[in-house]
Amino acid sequence: MKVKVLSLLVPALLVAGAANAAEVYNKDGNKLDLYGKVDGLHYFSDDKSVDGDQTYMRLGFKGETQVTDQLTGYGQWEYQIQGNAPESENNSWTRVAFAGLKFQDIGSFDYGRNYGVVYDVTSWTDVLPEFGGDTYGSDNFMQQRGNGFATYRNTDFFGLVDGLNFAVQYQGQNGSVSGENDPDFTGHGITNNGRKALRQNGDGVGGSITYDYEGFGVGAAVSSSKRTDAQNTAAYIGNGDRAETYTGGLKYDANNIYLAAQYTQTYNATRVGSLGWANKAQNFEAVAQYQFDFGLRPSVAYLQSKGKNLGTIGTRNYDDEDILKYVDVGATYYFNKNMSTYVDYKINLLDDNQFTRDAGINTDNIVALGLVYQF
């Protein structure tokens, strides 16, 4: 019986971090779920900047309220706290925080810190035990989590076509707060939540469409964002007026088998370590997993991000370079719905050369061991 229960529970746990949430309150049309996890995590690597303790925890809630029989309000917040640093250091941050309204079959609208629509497709390969999803990153235009997202989502195409979903999104500017990119004192480029240039963005729009049918899924997403003045200086490669992303993906999720692949082409949007952005980048991720009934889930994946005609900084000229390239082999074992353990081996295929050293890109292998309690 335990084996059968695990075979049903594990796929549900992989869908979303809140899938295993604990219901705190459910009365009179108001519902609040609490979810979280503690990951006792250790990295083994020759790269001393990552080797060692990586323990962290995440905590969040999802709430909704029934306003009318046609209208539902909702909100979500998720926070991460590092457990590998002394108490004197502030190592915690908000991952998502947004609120919205859902109008039955018409769709939903929300605003706040959320996931960009490009992640609607690229998330299909972001399922490795520890690594993965690194051909993009947070606060990277509309490719993953970011600030100031206004999102409209429609599920099952107005209730007419099961499995056909689409989204349209706008992101407001998140630029410098110091005024360093405002030489004329016009206020252009300044926002109230400033950050360094590598994590800035101008106004952007994007959209996604996905279709799922009997375990098969296909999806596509696009985004186009203005770039800030601070991003278009001689200090960085990859200057340009706009950052653009085009992605497509396929997946199969049935019969204990999970297969997914995505290809993304970006222009002035893929970060190249600390050097800036690739004028053009070709990103590819593929993953295969199998869920055994007794709780074991082995995983194998390949990820690559290749920058094209990267450009010049100072006296250095960079042409075509691999920004990221590795094979990932790992496995997760689920004791039950609340407890699991995993090992994940990142086999780095990058060469240690002048480019990787200039960009601060790691070229060493990493083995991750984790023990997870989630609720």
UniProtKB/Swiss-Prot annotation:
Disulfide bridge positions per record: none
Transmembrane segments: 34-42, 54-63, 74-84, 92-101, 107-115, 142-154, 164-171, 205-211, 216-223, 246-252, 257-264, 274-290, 296-303, 327-334, 339-346, 367-374
Compartments (UniProt record): Cell outer membrane
Keyword Signal: yes
Family matches, as Pfam families: Porin_1
Self-association state and partner proteins as the record states: Homotrimer. Forms mixed heterotrimers with OmpF; other mixed heterotrimers are also probable.
PANTHER family given in the database record: OUTER MEMBRANE PORIN C, PROTEIN YDDL-RELATED
Family assignment from sequence similarity: Belongs to the Gram-negative porin family.
Protein name: Outer membrane porin C
Native species: Escherichia coli O6:K15:H31 (strain 536 / UPEC)
